[in-house]
Amino acid sequence: MGSIRPFNVKRTAEELADKFPNVFGDKFEENKKKLEKMMPDVSKRTINMIAGYITRYAVKKKEKAKREIEENSLN
């Protein structure tokens, strides 16, 4: 069972993902490196938590868009 992320991690991750949609994607390592450059003074653990949530958030958005396209094509 996974752990629950703090609200500030979720909020920060969602804000960054929405603000920079072309920067972040569904690859954790790439997201982590980009975050390390954007926020050099944040701890490694926090960077990993934010990068993990951004990755998950990006995958969910991609799946949701795919589902909507499929639903629209059926109608």
Curated annotation (Swiss-Prot):
Gene3D superfamilies xref list: Ribosomal protein S17e-like (1.10.60.20)
InterPro entries on file: Ribosomal_eS17 (IPR001210), Ribosomal_eS17_CS (IPR018273), Ribosomal_eS17_sf (IPR036401)
Gene Ontology biological process terms, A to Z: translation
Entry keyword set: Ribonucleoprotein, Ribosomal protein
Pfam families, per database record: Ribosomal_S17e (PF00833)
GO MF term list: structural constituent of ribosome
One cellular-component annotation, GO: ribonucleoprotein complex
Stated family: Belongs to the eukaryotic ribosomal protein eS17 family.
Protein name: Small ribosomal subunit protein eS17
